[in-house]
């Protein structure tokens, strides 16, 4: 960092750091911690049984077999439908499978009385009892079944999904109850969904009742049971194929053994290096279609699935499941699947499993209770007593969360009190940021101007000591010291920008308020501003290549700013000067256009500040010359 070349190299390193940082924090390695993996040993009966299921696709017969149903013969003509409408939800229920068949979310009022718009992009019109609602469907039109399975290969399509349940409505208490008896008449399965009009939570109670005169081993280490809670979450594009950027927005998560973990949904959770090791060692004997994570001491605290703007969480209130299943099959939609291995019922006994379930936006105001009577932290009589205190980790963005939340709050206030457009809010925010850090930015501008003034002397040094790098470095530093120039004086503003950049990325990637926000020609500030898309290119891309105008403008301002502040440099330094914009173009090409807009306007402001500094310096020199 002792000359211009080093400063340019630092800028390159910082750009690469941003690139790697974004990949690390927001597209994490899908491998999970080794200490939560189920050990494939003969002493672990659960894992042994799981291995048998994976390799054969079948399970051993148990004392309480799941329903054996000829799926192709099932006809839904007797299926009953029912709806529950709350302040936030429209939920459709079906007696076939005793499940939620569709789950819609509509605009709702936040805990502070603010309107939170959910149905912002391509909403569906849902009619219930003659009243129309605009809402977004979150189950990918496949519903949430909350049904058991004793086979891994059937976890996303349980045999119970083909059983007709009896359906009972309780309009007063906003609840729906389902009941069905196993084909062998040995037990009964009951489910009750209870909603609360003002809240974004609902309660699910599952009951298993032993009808037989003998003990019923519903779940054991030898014959585990899998409960699928929430499948893969929506919404997702229906008018085009999913891109890599789209799939990176879907994830599944769980809190196990005191540690929060998440992996990409619809893809493998097997670590990259494990896959590489298997490739080189030829270890193809282990079927990695599924993996089970367990913790015998504390169990699963909660589990769920998420999309770009929404999450769905199932939190066991009165028990701790043994583990969680991770489906590694490509494009799977299994979602969050819990593992049970210790459910034993005496004759006539009723075994209950209670869950608090949240479906909503990935924001704290979505998870906040409006009525303190329902908040378990404020009321001992809350129906959600036992709710995990770590539930907020399901939408936490890590170390950048405070920056992200602060930026979102500032943008909302600017939106509220100035121009109600988030594009202008970003520009005003960029101006405010520039004003707050004006002393540092001015120091950078002064440093650049001084280095420009030294350009002829630097050129002489470079030419004179072209073959002696050590002496060239020494003379350069002597020149800087003599003229009181700090070659790294302009680095700090760039370093400060990094957390802002990452926070802006997260803000525009998963904040519901900024979803589908237009600005000038930009249709959606949360997406790249594609103004034209090429036709599909065979063997290269099926969706074509988009032309992103704002990213090109950003690079243009970056090049102009660099040339404006450049000093005498050798060919290698010139090459670095042009490599940097290419790197930036690569980084920003698929960024949310809101982030690119912010960076572009920061460049424009920096160009303006540098021009004013240079102009004032020339004016001052002319005055001194006259004197």
UniProtKB/Swiss-Prot annotation:
<dbReference type="InterPro" id="IPR038221">
    <property type="entry name" value="YidC_periplasmic_sf"/>
</dbReference>
<feature type="transmembrane region" description="Helical">
    <location>
        <begin position="8"/>
        <end position="28"/>
    </location>
</feature>
<protein>
    <recommendedName>
        <fullName>Membrane protein insertase YidC</fullName>
    </recommendedName>
</protein>
<feature type="compositionally biased region" description="Polar residues">
    <location>
        <begin position="33"/>
        <end position="57"/>
    </location>
</feature>
<keyword id="KW-0653">Protein transport</keyword>
<feature type="compositionally biased region" description="Basic and acidic residues">
    <location>
        <begin position="58"/>
        <end position="68"/>
    </location>
</feature>
<feature type="region of interest" description="Disordered">
    <location>
        <begin position="33"/>
        <end position="68"/>
    </location>
</feature>
<dbReference type="GO" id="GO:0015031">
    <property type="term" value="P:protein transport"/>
</dbReference>
<keyword id="KW-0143">Chaperone</keyword>
<dbReference type="Pfam" id="PF02096">
    <property type="entry name" value="60KD_IMP"/>
</dbReference>
<feature type="transmembrane region" description="Helical">
    <location>
        <begin position="575"/>
        <end position="595"/>
    </location>
</feature>
<feature type="transmembrane region" description="Helical">
    <location>
        <begin position="488"/>
        <end position="508"/>
    </location>
</feature>
<dbReference type="GO" id="GO:0005886">
    <property type="term" value="C:plasma membrane"/>
</dbReference>
<keyword id="KW-1003">Cell membrane</keyword>
<keyword id="KW-0997">Cell inner membrane</keyword>
<feature type="transmembrane region" description="Helical">
    <location>
        <begin position="417"/>
        <end position="437"/>
    </location>
</feature>
<dbReference type="InterPro" id="IPR001708">
    <property type="entry name" value="YidC/ALB3/OXA1/COX18"/>
</dbReference>
<dbReference type="GO" id="GO:0032977">
    <property type="term" value="F:membrane insertase activity"/>
</dbReference>
<keyword id="KW-1133">Transmembrane helix</keyword>
<dbReference type="InterPro" id="IPR028055">
    <property type="entry name" value="YidC/Oxa/ALB_C"/>
</dbReference>
<keyword id="KW-0813">Transport</keyword>
<comment type="function">
    <text>Required for the insertion and/or proper folding and/or complex formation of integral membrane proteins into the membrane. Involved in integration of membrane proteins that insert both dependently and independently of the Sec translocase complex, as well as at least some lipoproteins. Aids folding of multispanning membrane proteins.</text>
</comment>
<comment type="similarity">
    <text>Belongs to the OXA1/ALB3/YidC family. Type 1 subfamily.</text>
</comment>
<feature type="transmembrane region" description="Helical">
    <location>
        <begin position="536"/>
        <end position="556"/>
    </location>
</feature>
<keyword id="KW-0812">Transmembrane</keyword>
<dbReference type="GO" id="GO:0051205">
    <property type="term" value="P:protein insertion into membrane"/>
</dbReference>
<dbReference type="InterPro" id="IPR047196">
    <property type="entry name" value="YidC_ALB_C"/>
</dbReference>
<comment type="subunit">
    <text>Interacts with the Sec translocase complex via SecD. Specifically interacts with transmembrane segments of nascent integral membrane proteins during membrane integration.</text>
</comment>
<keyword id="KW-0472">Membrane</keyword>
<dbReference type="InterPro" id="IPR019998">
    <property type="entry name" value="Membr_insert_YidC"/>
</dbReference>
């Amino acid at each position: 960092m002792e000359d211009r070349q080093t400063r340019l190299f630092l800028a390159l390193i910082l750009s690469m750091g941003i690139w790697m940082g974004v990949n690390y924090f927001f597209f994490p390695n899908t491998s999970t911690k080794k200490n939560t993996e189920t050990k494939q040993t003969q002493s672990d009966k659960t894992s042994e049984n799981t291995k048998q299921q994976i390799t054969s696709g079948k399970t051993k017969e148990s004392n309480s077999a799941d329903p054996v149903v000829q799926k192709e013969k099932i006809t839904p003509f007797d299926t009953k439908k029912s709806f529950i409408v709350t302040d936030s939800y429209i939920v459709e229920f079906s007696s076939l499978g005793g499940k939620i068949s569709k789950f819609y979310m509509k605009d709702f009022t936040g805990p502070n009385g603010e309107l939170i718009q959910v149905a912002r992009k391509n909403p569906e019109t849902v009619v219930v009892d003659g009243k129309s609602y605009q809402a977004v469907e979150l189950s990918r039109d496949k519903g949430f079944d909350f049904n058991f399975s004793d086979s891994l290969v059937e976890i996303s399509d349980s045999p119970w999904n083909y059983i007709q349940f009896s359906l009972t409505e309780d309009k007063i208490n906003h609840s729906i109850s389902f009941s069905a008896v196993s084909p062998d008449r040995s037990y009964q399965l009951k489910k009750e969904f209870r909603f609360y009009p003002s809240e974004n939570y609902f309660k699910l109670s599952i009951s298993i009742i032993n009808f037989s005169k003998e003990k019923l081993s519903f779940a054991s280490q030898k014959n585990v049971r899998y409960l699928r809670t929430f499948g893969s979450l929506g919404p997702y594009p229906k008018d085009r194929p999913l891109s890599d950027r789209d799939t990176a927005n879907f994830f599944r998560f769980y809190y196990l053994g005191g540690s929060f973990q998440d992996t990409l949904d619809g893809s493998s959770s097997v670590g990259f290096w494990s896959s590489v090791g298997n490739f080189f060692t030829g270890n193809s004997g282990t079927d990695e279609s599924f993996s089970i994570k367990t913790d015998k001491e504390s169990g699963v605290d909660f589990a769920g699935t998420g999309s770009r703007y929404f999450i769905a969480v199932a939190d066991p209130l009165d028990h701790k499941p043994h583990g969680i299943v991770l489906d590694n099959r490509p494009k799977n939609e299994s979602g969050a699947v819990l593992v049970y291995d210790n459910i034993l019922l005496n004759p006539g006994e009723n075994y209950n499993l209670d869950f608090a379930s949240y479906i909503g936006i990935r924001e704290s105001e979505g998870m906040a209770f409006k009525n303190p009577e329902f908040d378990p932290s404020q009321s001992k009589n809350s129906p959600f007593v036992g709710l995990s205190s770590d539930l907020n980790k399901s939408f936490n963005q890590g170390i950048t969360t405070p920056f992200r939340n602060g930026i979102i709050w500032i943008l909302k206030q600017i939106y509220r009190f100035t121009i109600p457009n988030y594009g202008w809010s970003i520009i005003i925010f960029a101006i405010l940021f520039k004003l707050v850090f004006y002393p540092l930015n001015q120091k950078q501008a002064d440093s650049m101007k001084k280095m420009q003034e030294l350009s002829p002397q630097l050129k002489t040094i470079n030419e004179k000591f072209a073959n002696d790098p050590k002496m060239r470095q020494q003379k350069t530093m002597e020149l800087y010291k003599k003229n009181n120039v700090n070659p790294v004086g302009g680095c700090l503003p760039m370093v400060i920008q990094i957390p802002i950049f990452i926070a802006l990325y997260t803000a525009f990637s998963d904040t519901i308020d900024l979803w589908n926000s237009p600005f000038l020609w930009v249709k959606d500030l949360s997406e790249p501003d594609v103004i034209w898309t090429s036709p599909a290119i065979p063997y290269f891309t099926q969706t074509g290549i988009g032309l992103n105008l704002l990213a090109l403008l950003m690079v243009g301002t970056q090049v102009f700013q660099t040339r404006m502040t450049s000093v005498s440099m050798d060919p290698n330094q010139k090459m670095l000067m042009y490599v940097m914009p290419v790197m930036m173009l690569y980084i920003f090409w698929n960024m949310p256009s809101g982030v690119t807009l912010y960076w572009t306007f920061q460049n424009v402001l920096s160009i303006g500040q540098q021009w004013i500094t240079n102009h004032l310096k020339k004016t001052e020199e002319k005055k001194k010359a006259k004197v």
